[in-house]
Amino acid sequence: MKSFIAKQYACPVEYTLTLIGGKWKPVILWHLANDGIKRYGEIKKLLIGITHKMLSQQLKELEADGLIHREEYHQIPPKVEYSLTDKGKTLIPILQLMCQWGQENMEHI
């Protein structure tokens, strides 16, 4: 895990947002929760506007925080798959509520 985890947080929400906050992490987790195992290129296609550098960074952080698993297959061409860990799967109800809230409020923006 990252060294910043040792930081003292004012509340559990702050800690949670440190792990899943930002523009891309919740969306990456959402797609892995709904679609299951995905390869890097598949994730990249789903996230319109994300750069290669940003996607790589977000995936590395999610993996370091124990929310996703990276499976590397030693073959030609190289193959890497991403999936939710058990810890990552515990976020599914939160992601579902975020989706529901978005569906109910998106048209009002």
Where are the language model's segments positioned?
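Basic amphipathic alpha-helical segments that dock to polyanions
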Residues: L55, L59-L62
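N-terminal helix-turn-helix DNA-binding core of bacterial DNA-binding proteins
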Residues: C11-M54, Q75, E81
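Basic, amphipathic "hinge/linker" alpha-helix immediately C-terminal to the N-terminal HTH DNA-binding motif
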Residues: H74-L97
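A short, conserved structural fragment
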Residues: E63-E71
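Recognition helices and adjacent regulatory flanks at domain boundaries
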Residues: M1-Y9, L46
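Alpha-helical linker/hinge and terminal dimerization helices associated
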Residues: D65, I94-M106
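N-terminal amphipathic/basic helix or basic patch
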Residues: Q8-C11, P93
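Short loop/turn motifs at secondary-structure junctions and domain boundaries
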Residues: K7, Y73-H74
